[in-house]
Curated annotation (Swiss-Prot):
Low complexity biased stretches: 1012-1028
Compositionally biased tracts (Polar residues): 404-416, 968-995, 1033-1042
The organism of origin for this protein: Rattus norvegicus (Rat)
Protein name according to UniProt: A-kinase anchor protein 11
Residue ranges of the region described as PKA-RII binding region: 905-918
GO process terms (BP): cortical actin cytoskeleton organization; positive regulation of establishment of endothelial barrier; protein localization; protein localization to endosome; renal water homeostasis
Length: 1129
């Protein structure tokens, strides 16, 4: 509930109608506070300031009904307090929520809610009022709720009718003359009745409202008389119209009576509302502010007389109300003013303490000499401060009261000193925030916009003025009915019949002053209600897209619509300041109307700013920054998810019927995938722009609306061209089009694009026109320019591929993998990368079962689709998306891979590359650590000998054990074994950088036992049959390879020398992951020695290996079955 209160926060002085409800309650304090909080937290939102929309708040309000006790007390005191309040200038403070309540009820009340209140419930019979018993009338709270709903609905309808029949820009004098003529000429008819033929349902609504309002008010008065028959009524007469004072101690038993209308003085009365020009309210209609109580009952005497004139209306609209004012009742029924004016728990606690300390029982509070500041800006600042204070208390570290100072810090360790400094700094920060909360004056925020503040003052003035208007109309209606009831038992009552309801009493005569006041009030009422309706419509269109219910207003609005459109053009930014869409990632204290999420984000930004200014610890700044970043990330994610949900819900609830969609549905009949594309783009079009006739709807849309609408237009034109080609080519002769022709029309922009408008047809000419300059239209019509025609199957397949690519572009490239992930430590293979892409692309075109040629063609088409033409686009967002998609398509290899047979090979290749990269990182420090240099030649020679011996032994074992395996597989395994060895050269030419892996424990893949058998200076050359003179020659290989033709010829001759007829021929093939991965000399020597050791005479090297082997084959000679190195290598 506290969270909801934060969202539903409104200025404190705009809750008068709810305050009157709270005043009339007879429940104890604690029980009332709970019920009041639950009720008013849902009733508070106006649809402008809060983040919860009005329809949701209204629907949530339905289960919460106030008990019958509240409604009985309200019905008892409705007309009494209306009479007592009069037209005093102080009553405007209780009226600022009327315009918002009207909007709230308009959004929440359905016509079906009016049905329980039929005219049969209150039907006069035999000229007397057949009143129902209080138990019957108040049997259920639902009936009372429907009563108030009907009254509000009636007020709004009649106001709109008056706006239709009255020109708001007429001068006051003209209106006064016209009003006088109308009253003299036709005293029975009213302008509302004249406007009735313009609206078909006006008369029925008037009939129902008149019976309902009269019966309710009459029942209230009769019941008050029956409950209190012995209490004297005190008529109070004043010098000016309907401005009445009351005693400070106003109880339920005291019912001040209205003017005695027998005086027939023209100064006392306001003209009857039904006969006035622009008053716009029914004589019997009881608005939601009819239960007002006196907001100045704390005065010790009778209030001074004031004249309600145009000047007073303008001036009193800005008079604030102090927090201490309240209506005093009996001691058992006294309520705190904090309950009446504040929902926020912080304000309740604060003001409750003040009232408990200052109020003396049975005495009214003292009148404040100077009205306290109660403007909306002040309340917002105070709320922000209190929220910050609570957050500061919440986040304050639990530190002891006595913090150690610098004197004791010296003996502590460095870590403890740092911790203490951090705690002291945070404690000072929190204390400063708390002191700022407790201060009475709030500092001005420089980020506030002057224009927005000005518009906020305008809204306050409009609220107060509209409440004045409704108050005057209510009092006139109540006084009229009161006069009728007093005359009821003397003369046979005929006032409640429909013809005589509009008759004017003699006492309600019209003075010039009252006529001018009513004319001015009518002008202002039209503007106020139009402004409120405009704001409500704008917010509804922006958040929910209720096009049919909100944007297209029922009935003929006439001149009010024109005035509204003019105001939209003249003041384009005022509505946007009211409809407060939270800005994204704006630092600082910039929110005028704070909510929970804005205060949280704002608090983190403020903490960071203070930390930087005061030189705080960098760790604290980073912590606060990280928390704000995480919060914003979560908020943005939730916002994106909410957008998606809104689009889906709006599509289900309100299907859009536009010319583009209708035309697409008529044309796209040949391919199911076209309908999928249109549906997707229809959702984005619907979210992007609503068919609202108010310009403010387009002005307050999401910034991505233009991009989405352009994407929709592009997809519509593309779908139209594809459909036209399909329809035309379905009847064409089935001759296959050459692939070169298809590629030509996809790669090049032909002349048909320039004549796009004529080719596409009148339906899509408008959508294609904005995109001709950008080159986004697909050139599918150029296929028909060739003489051979085109097959229908080819066109349909192309259409499916384009649609699939368009859907991929719409959903974004987030599902696709990046090409850089191939070298990640997770060892993502090409097979793993290709499989999700195939499934993703084929999911939209229903081709999962065929991954062969269809997938290949899909890649071809999708590469040349909208993604290939993204560079001319003017929008950077679309360009970036399409560029990513283009890169993705280029990354997919254009070959067929048998994933079942080649997955193992790909896995090994990637694994070797990763292992090799890891080894190279450690090789740089190996030379320095090992100490191998000019003095370590013997160690290098012995180590090389052991490597050769172990390699030949292991490889020979592998070859002999895999005689049954294919030659290619064995060669592949041998090649992968040797790639594990990485050899480098230092400046002296000796082998110093050697690394070998110990991960594999099988004897055919590593040299794990090499280190055990090597002692650093001994060697086992005798095992190879090498002569001792080899010791005299340093075993070193040159780095350069000879590329001459002589070496190649000798290589071929020597290779042919050793070839003899044998059972099998071994083909040695090396696969290099990247150039220079393995020393080619060492690899060729080992691969040449292995088959010789195993007596395999027939072995063939690849072309690339022959060059590396040429220097070695020319330097050996075979003598008596022994190996001898006859010359230096």
């Amino acid at each position: 509930m506290q969270k909801m209160q934060c969202h539903l926060r409104r200025p404190l002085h705009s809750s008068s109608s709810f305050s009157s409800q709270a005043v009339m309650m007879t429940k104890p304090m604690q029980e009332h506070k709970k019920e009041y909080t639950a009720q008013q937290a849902l009733f508070r939102p106006s649809g402008i300031v809060t983040s919860i929309p009005v329809p949701l708040a209204g629907s949530a309000l339905l289960p919460y009904h106030v008990s019958s006790t509240l409604y009985q007390s309200k019905s008892l005191s409705s007309s009494e307090h209306n009479k007592a309040n009069g037209g005093s200038p102080q009553e405007h403070i209780a009226m600022e929520s009327s315009a918002e309540e009207v909007d709230c009820f308009k959004n929440t009340c359905l016509p079906s809610e009016l049905s329980p209140c039929s005219q049969n419930d209150f039907k006069p019979t035999n000229g007397d009022i057949d009143m129902q018993s209080p138990s019957k009338l108040m049997s259920g709270s639902m009936i009372i709720s429907n009563f108030s709903t009907a009254m509000v609905h009636t007020i709004v309808n009649e106001t709109l009718e008056s706006m239709t029949s009255f020109k708001a820009t007429k001068p006051v004098d003209t209106n006064a003359d016209y009003l006088t003529k109308t009253i003299k000429g036709k005293p029975v008819l009213s302008l509302c009745d004249q406007a009735a033929p313009q609206q078909n349902k006006a008369s029925s609504k008037d009939m129902f409202a008149e019976h309902l309002s009269k019966s309710i008010i009459k029942h209230s008065l009769d019941k008050s008389k029956s409950v209190l028959p012995n209490i004297d009524k005190k008529p109070v007469s004043k010098e000016h119209m309907l401005v009445l004072g009351e005693e400070s101690q106003l109880t339920l038993g005291e019912t001040p009576k209205f003017l005695d209308f027998s005086d027939n003085s023209p100064q006392y009365c306001v003209p009857e509302c039904k006969d006035s020009v622009g008053f716009g309210f029914s004589l019997e209609a009881l608005p939601p502010c009819s239960m007002m109580t006196s907001q100045k009952s704390d005065l010790k005497g009778v209030m001074k007389d004031k004249v309600v004139t145009r000047h007073n209306l303008t001036n009193t609209a800005f008079e604030p109300l102090s927090f201490g004012q309240e209506s005093s009742f009996r001691p058992s029924q006294t309520l705190s003013s904090a309950v009446l004016t504040c929902v926020d728990s912080l304000h309740v606690e604060d003001k409750q303490k003040i009232r408990d300390r200052n109020v003396i029982p049975d005495t009214p509070p003292s009148t404040p000499l100077v009205p306290s500041q109660t403007s909306s800006e002040w309340d917002i600042k105070k709320l922000t401060k209190q929220l910050k204070g609570e957050l500061a208390k919440e986040f304050a570290p639990a530190t002891p009261p006595s913090t150690p100072h610098n004197s004791s810090v010296g003996s502590l360790s460095e870590n403890e000193q740092t911790t203490i400094e951090k705690e002291e700094f945070m404690l000072k920060l929190m204390r400063s925030l708390s002191e700022e909360v407790e201060s009475s004056e709030g500092e001005e925020h420089p980020e506030m916009d002057v224009k927005s503040e000005h518009s906020g003052k305008k809204g306050q003035f409009a609220d107060a003025l509209a409440t004045h208007i409704i108050s005057l109309a209510t009092e006139v209606a109540a006084s009229h009915l009161d006069h009728e009831i007093t005359q009821e038992f003397k003369v046979q009552n005929s006032h409640l019949t429909v013809p005589s309801q509009r008759s004017m009493l003699p006492a309600l005569s019209h003075s010039d002053e009252s006529i001018q006041t009513c004319s001015f009030a009518s002008d202002m009422a039209a503007g106020v209600i139009a402004e409120a309706e405009k704001v409500a419509n704008t917010r509804s269109c922006m958040l929910f897209g209720h096009e049919r219910t909100i944007c297209h207003v029922e009935g003929d609005r006439g001149k009010a619509e024109e005035k509204l459109d003019v105001e939209d053009i003249a003041h384009p930014r005022e509505v946007e300041t009211c409809v407060l869409s939270l800005p994204s990632c704006m630092p600082g204290l910039t929110y005028k109307y704070p909510s929970c999420e804005s205060v949280t984000d704002e608090y983190a930004g403020h903490i960071i700013q203070v930390l930087k200014q005061e030189g705080g610890n960098s760790e604290l700044i980073m912590d606060q920054y990280a928390s704000r970043l995480a919060y914003r990330s979560v908020k943005s994610g939730v916002r994106e998810a909410a957008k998606t949900v809104k689009v889906k819900c709006s599509l289900k609830l309100f299907p859009m019927h536009t010319s583009h969609v209708k035309t697409n549905k008529e044309l796209l009949f040949s391919s199911k995938e076209h309908h999928q594309e249109v549906d997707k783009k229809r959702q984005r079009k619907k979210y992007g722009s609503h068919p609202c006739k108010y310009q403010t709807c387009d002005r307050t849309q999401d910034p991505c609306r233009n991009e989405l609408s352009e994407l929709y237009r592009f997809s519509a034109s593309l779908a139209s061209s594809i459909t036209r080609d399909v329809k035309k080519q379905l009847t064409a002769p089935k001759v296959d089009l050459p692939k070169s022709s298809t590629d030509c029309c996809l790669f090049e922009k032909s002349e048909c694009v320039d004549n796009r408008e004529n080719v596409t047809g009148p339906e899509f000419s408008k959508s294609c026109q904005p995109l001709q300059n950008h080159g986004l239209c697909q050139n599918t019509s150029s296929l028909s320019g060739y003489s051979c025609g085109e097959s229908a199957h080819t066109v349909e397949q192309y259409a499916r591929k384009v649609v699939g690519d368009t859907l991929e572009l719409s959903l974004g490239p987030a599902v696709f993998l990046n090409s850089e992930t191939t070298t990640s430590p997770d060892r993502i293979t090409y097979a793993e990368k290709l499989s999700p892409l195939i499934n993703e692309a084929c999911r939209y075109c229903d081709l999962k079962e065929s991954h062969g040629c269809i997938r290949n063609s899909a890649q071809l088409f999708s590469k040349q689709g909208p993604c290939a033409s993204a560079k001319p686009s003017s929008h950077s967002k679309l360009s970036s998306i399409r560029q990513k998609s283009r890169i993705f398509h280029l990354d997919v290899p254009q070959i067929h891979l048998n994933l079942d047979k080649r997955a193992v090979l790909a896995e090994k290749i990637v694994a070797e590359a990763i292992e090799k990269a890891e080894r190279e990182l450690s090789n740089t420090s190996l030379a320095a650590d090992s100490g191998i240099g000019q003095d370590g030649i013997s160690f290098a020679e012995s180590l090389t000998t052991e490597i050769m011996t172990t390699a030949m032994t292991n490889a020979g074992h592998a070859v002999s054990s895999s005689k049954e395996v294919e030659d290619f597989q064995s060669t592949e395994s041998l090649g992968s074994q040797q790639m594990n060895l990485s050899v480098g050269e230092d400046s002296t030419g000796s082998w110093s950088n050697l690394s070998f892996e110990d991960d594999h424990q099988d004897e055919s893949s590593s040299f794990h036992h090499l280190s055990e058998s090597s002692n650093g200076n001994s060697s086992s050359w005798s095992s190879l049959g090498l002569e001792g003179d080899l010791y005299e020659n340093n075993l070193s290989f040159p780095t350069s390879d000879s590329d001459g033709p002589d070496d190649r010829e000798s290589e071929q001759e020597d290779g042919a020398e050793g070839l003899q007829p044998s059972g099998k021929t071994l083909l040695i093939v090396n696969i290099d992951v990247e150039p220079g991965a393995v020393d080619p000399q060492l690899r060729v020597i080992l691969q040449w020695l292995i088959p010789r050791r195993r007596k395999l005479e027939n072995f063939i090297f690849s072309t690339l290996q022959r060059r590396s082997l040429s220097y070695f084959q020319s330097s050996y000679r075979r003598e008596d079955g022994k190996w001898a190195m006859s010359c230096r290598l």
